[in-house]
Amino acid sequence: MSKVKKNEEALSEVLVDVNRVTKVVKGGRRFAFSAYVVVGDKAGRVGAGHGKAKEVNEARGKAKQAAKKRMMKVPLYQNRTIHHDVVGKSGAAKVILRRAKAGTGVIAGGSMRAIFDSLGVHDIVAKSIGSTNVYAMISATFDALNKLASPKSIAIRRGKKVHEISVKSYIQVNK
């Protein structure tokens, strides 16, 4: 079995939204379906995609392929939460993501919960402000996730060592 197949099997898929859309033509109405899917490996990689087709299953398949193409790696703290608080925006939607202590759980609504479950986050507090449109909320959540950075990546970017920028490691080194 190839690596692509193994990765494909490990991905979890969540159908976030399905819409029936209509195109009015001279002869009447043409119906089609629009689907939005979130895909993740529950280990720090997640993506979202949109697909349109005449049948729901075809739209879902197209959305899944689009989500796989748009997958991104998110740095997780102890493989359970995010490293720091962050805010994401998309249009009128605003999302605030806050790290949480172990055992807190996923406190998030709707489409944000689907993203965190697919991502593999176990402890997070998320608040949405403004628009509750599914597309805008997912876009704002991905904007916030793109802003996340681990102490290691920040240290590399600044040309320093991790213990020089991380408060906890600084305290441990200078005890």
Swiss-Prot record:
GO cellular component: a single term: small ribosomal subunit
Gene Ontology MF term list: rRNA binding; structural constituent of ribosome
One record GO biological process: translation
Pfam family of the protein (one): Ribosomal_S5_C
Keyword terms of this UniProt record: Ribonucleoprotein, Ribosomal protein, RNA-binding, rRNA-binding
Entries under InterPro entries matching the protein: Ribosomal_Su5_D2-typ_SF, Ribosomal_uS5, Ribosomal_uS5_bac-type, Ribosomal_uS5_C, Ribosomal_uS5_N, Ribosomal_uS5_N_CS, Ribsml_uS5_D2-typ_fold_subgr
Sequence ranges assigned to domain S5 DRBM in this UniProt record: 11-74
HAMAP family associated with the record: Ribosomal_uS5_B
UniProt-listed NCBIfam families: rpsE_bact
This protein's name: Small ribosomal subunit protein uS5
Native source species: Rickettsia typhi (strain ATCC VR-144 / Wilmington)
Gene name for this UniProt entry: rpsE
